[in-house]
């Protein structure tokens, strides 16, 4: 696994300008469900228009910021709960090296997990499993993390995320299993941190269970800031959403994370504020590799790339786009552009 990850150490770092530029000309793992027609929130044609730059992305920035903030926390918790280390969480795998040009995947990482055998089956060993296993084995896995803002978490992988995981597995030959990690985080004030179910109920519904872990996210300005830090965990829902949208401007702030179970705010310069978090659900769902997945789906990716090239090369991109759209598919509408971001929330 380590040798494989090292192959891509010089690839564009995730969320860098070079990474964004590469993704504009490729079908990434997160695009795949839409391209295959499996995403109920975003169609092949909306994805095509987005890649062809026919409209300005209307992302749900609050939900994007939330997912980015808690991806790091989820990795820390995965390492703690499974006694492992996540690597390769910043690489970009270009499918060209495996014969799939135009397709890529940017995994959330790779790690080793311990599987324990009991009652004629294998399960993922965590610090919460108080089980004496008949046998154990350590295997490398691909990691895919989601942290929905308010969407309910079910004990299964949403169908529109499965292509992203299978894409990552297909482009990672040494790996035969992935894990889908989905966590339910809730915001709280610093005074609410600890072994209790107190959260900011203006932002989230009340919780009846106790948290698995908690911690603090600290937000610092990149400029000199001398005002007293604010406890963002006590904000009302709308103001907190506005804060998340502001954090989307990454050049204005730096984000710092406490270790899990920390309750004391860190002392550092230019702190604008902080908020507490608690995690109440942390699911780790195994996903086995489908050996033929990418080979079977690649012709659709190729068709998408041909359509994209045709639009970009046209002197009238929008007119060409409309011709490419299926007869039953209307051209871009404001509703379509807005609706696909609902998946993030």
Curated annotation (Swiss-Prot):
GO terms for cellular component: host cell cytoplasm. GO terms for biological process: symbiont-mediated suppression of host NF-kappaB cascade. Keywords: Host cytoplasm, Host-virus interaction, Inhibition of host NF-kappa-B by virus. It is found in: Host cytoplasm. InterPro entries: NF-kappa-B_Signaling_Reg, PDDEXK-like_dom_sf, Restrct_endonuc-II-like, YqaJ_viral_recombinase. Pfam families: YqaJ. Belongs to the asfivirus D345L family. Interacts with IKKA/CHUK and IKBKB. Plays a role in the negative regulation of host NF-kappa-B signaling pathway. Mechanistically, recruits IKKA/CHUK and IKBKB to suppress their kinase activity towards NFKBIA. This is Protein D345L.
């Amino acid at each position: 696994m380590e040798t494989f990850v090292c192959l891509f150490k010089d690839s564009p770092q995730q969320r860098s300008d070079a990474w964004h530029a590469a993704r504009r000309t490729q079908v990434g793992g997160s695009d795949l469900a839409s391209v295959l027609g499996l995403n109920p929130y975003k169609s092949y044609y909306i994805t095509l228009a987005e890649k062809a730059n026919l409209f300005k992305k209307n992302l749900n920035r609050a939900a994007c910021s939330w997912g980015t903030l808690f991806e790091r926390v989820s990795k820390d918790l995965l390492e703690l709960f499974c006694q492992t280390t996540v690597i390769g969480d910043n690489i970009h795998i270009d499918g060209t090296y495996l014969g799939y040009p135009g397709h890529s995947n940017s995994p959330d990482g790779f790690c080793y997990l311990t599987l324990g055998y009991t009652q004629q089956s294998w399960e993922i060993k965590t610090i919460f499993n108080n089980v004496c296993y008949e046998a154990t084995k350590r295997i490398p896995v691909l990691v895919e993390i989601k942290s929905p803002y308010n969407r309910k978490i079910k004990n299964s992988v949403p169908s529109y995320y499965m292509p992203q995981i299978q894409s990552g597995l297909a482009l990672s030959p040494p790996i035969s299993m992935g894990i889908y990690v989905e966590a339910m985080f809730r915001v709280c004030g610093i005074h609410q941190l600890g072994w209790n179910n107190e959260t900011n109920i203006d932002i989230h519904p009340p919780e009846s269970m106790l948290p698995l872990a908690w911690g603090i996210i600290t937000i610092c300005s990149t400029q000199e800031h001398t005002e007293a830090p604010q406890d963002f965990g006590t904000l009302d829902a709308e103001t907190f959403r506005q804060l998340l949208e502001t954090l989307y401007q990454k050049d204005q702030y730096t984000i710092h994370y406490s270790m899990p179970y920390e309750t004391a705010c860190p002392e550092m310069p230019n702190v604008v504020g902080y908020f507490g978090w608690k995690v109440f659900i942390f699911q780790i769902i195994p996903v086995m590799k489908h050996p033929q997945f990418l080979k079977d789906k690649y012709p659709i990716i190729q068709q998408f790339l041909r359509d994209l090239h045709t639009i970009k090369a046209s002197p009238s991109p929008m007119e060409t786009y409309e011709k490419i759209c299926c007869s039953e598919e209307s051209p871009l509408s404001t509703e379509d552009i807005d609706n696909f971001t609902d998946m993030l929330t």
